[in-house]
Amino acid sequence: MDQKKLLKNIGIGLGAIVLFLLLSYGYVPQVLDGKIVNQSDISGYMGMSHEMNEWNAAHPDDPTYWTDSMFGGMPTTAISTQNGGDYTQSIYNLLLTGKRPATYLFIALLGAFLLMLALGISWPLALGGAVAVAFCSYNFQIIQVGHNTKMQAIAFFPWVLAALVYTYRSTKGKGRWLAKTLLGAVLFGVALSMQVKANHQQITYYLAILVLLYALVELIDVLTKNKDRIGRFFVASALLLVVGCVGIATNVNKLLPLAKYTPHTMRGGSELTQDGDVKGGGLDLDYATAWSYGWEELPNLMIPNFNGGASAQAVDPAKSETIKLLKRAGQSNTREIAKSLPMYWGPQPFTAGPMYMGAITVFLFILGLFCYKGKEKWWLVVGTVIAVLMAVGNHFMAFTKFCFNVLPLYNKFRTVSMALVVLQVTLPMLGFLALDRIVKDWVEPKDFLKKSGIAFALTGGLCLLFFLIPTLAGDFTAASDAGQQDVLVEAFQQDRIALLRQDALVSFILIAVAWGLLLWALLPKDAPRYRKLIAGVAICALVTVNLFTTGKRYLNADHFTTPKDFGKPFAERPVDQMIKADPDPSYRVLDLSVNVFNSSIPSYHHKSVGGYSPAKLQRYQDLIEHYLTGEINAVYGSMQEAKTIDEVEAGLPATPVLNALNTRYIVVGGDYAPVYNKAALGNAWFVDEAVRAASPDEEIAFLGSVDLRHQAVIGKDMPDVTFAPADSTDTIVLASYAPNELRYHYKAAGNRLAVFSEIYYPDGWKAQVDGTPADVLRSDWTLRSMALPAGEHDIVMRFEPDSYRVGAGISRASSITLILLLLLSLGGMFLPARKK
């Protein structure tokens, strides 16, 4: 590359970076004032991670991989990924430098720009294509609710594809093709390392499907059209495979603990039987497909409010029939109500918004089906179709069951509608490939008129049809309308129709203008060449304005708050202060002032019985379903007639499982004293008898029939233990508490079986009695137990999972290898030039 061209490319790159910074920070200027997005999921993270973060900050040389803050205790595997050993983590952190979420948008824009360039798209159009990828509405929705890891994984998605495409295209060159191919493969490994580092395996899974499809398309191409490049294809594929594995291996410090943890979680399935069948490994199919995209929702890919938009949708209070009705009924604060009306009427339980890809993007994609002849079309079309079939989930159960039962790991994922993130890259890629070829005069004007007319009819025509006859979309009623007054439901319907018609008209106009610009540029035949560039740039501008303004529906100034206000839910209440006055180092709290199993706010202050996590331990989930929910409801019931805390305490029902979890305090409100549960069994106790269960079903059933204070239920997979009944002189106490280490002191007149009110987990908890290793057993379905010798002894339990140590070692070696490969491949690009 000559110096002039190099300087030009550097200028284009720097210009793109400046533009993307302006777009990213211009979209969320609030971050420049120190504000943050009021994200519900991040609020939940703050609660569940508080104990871990506090400990790790105070003990950096002894980090904890366990927390007792949620669900009685669980590994931090699904909470934190800050594990040592990965030297490429510094690169990741550097890329994320800046104010979030602006930095997420910037990374997505830059990666998509590189992808468009790798596909051979001219840089002015590549800028527009980058916006079409990064500013899809779904990205703003997940940022607003706090799915940050998902957004990071999506942001690095196009980086991986860009390196993949560059690698295979490098095999076509005549000079230095091997050096370029090696560089591409190494960049692929680095990009994949970053994408996996985001720690959202489901997005990575969809990315893997696209990667495999592209490799397959390349293989078919060399076998059918370019047999002289078969050798180069296999060289490139081998390099991609090897270096890609190295890139993934840099994350083994996270992946190995996760692999150990997943089989024990809800994603690993339950050991219990249901209707005579043992549940297989993986999520329940109904649970996994609860959020399935309906076939009837697909038009909202180009008409955002086709199905009402969001479950809590903002409407114009001056035009809304619902708001007018409420005003006539004397309702106050209608302006606030107008910000959150139940407009969504699709088949999903609820949604933050549609998967709007952009009306012009969809038009260009359809146009690409007819106008673009390159092999990439089939890659993108097949990828799009597979993603749609996955996303519709329970609306095409035959395909879903096939994927669930056949595809490796697929049954570990939920919210199948997420597969539509694939369309965020496939639709803009094919659409802007087509636009690029049109601008470059690769399309015959006469042929274009016919094909573009068909594309316009299929997209703009459909939008116009729904504007004129909106009832073609359905009856505009939602499941959430049930129980509402007919007059209110009718108002909802009118608003939903208005939302559809408004967006259908806007989408029609956008598509019509884009089509008109292309016709103006190509017809007549002697039209000046500059028209095509003007048309292309104008279309890019339209895409930007449309996605920018539509995205503001889901992420705008109203969603930002100050860090101080964001932390208010975690402010210490009077009841928290009262509980913390207890000198005992460990006990559990049941907070009835929140949704017990869907809130981690209590975990910020206490060791909670509840919490929120879609990856909680399956045995604890079984305990919730079989016992805890019933016992909590019984507590609620006993409180109905009580007028004082003392009356609540006196009237507490029998709650044997809560007692075994050492649930000492029950919170009924932030300003009230806590209810003291005198029946809590404490941190540890000796039992008189072991009750052996013949099956998991029998094991959990015994919890409802035995006396957990004096009997321990032992599963069939646990070894036999010999011990004598407890004596009145026996004692066992918790001497010190840390999330990753528990110390007990006990005295026993004979050999004993001790049960601890701590959650059992097989991979990592190691125990010693006076320095001698001892086995940690499982009792009472979820609790730890130990067979202890007679006498006076000290017990130390430490959580030291081998997976973290081994994973860190592999990550260390892999990250060093990847960094060296990157340096060598970059050097290899310059060596031939220097020799000349």
Regions found by a protein language model. Give the residues of each.
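Transmembrane-helix motifs of polytopic, lipid-linked glycan transferases
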Residues: 103-120, 361-364, 430
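Active-site-proximal, structured, solvent-exposed surfaces of multi-pass membrane proteins
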Residues: 363, 706-836
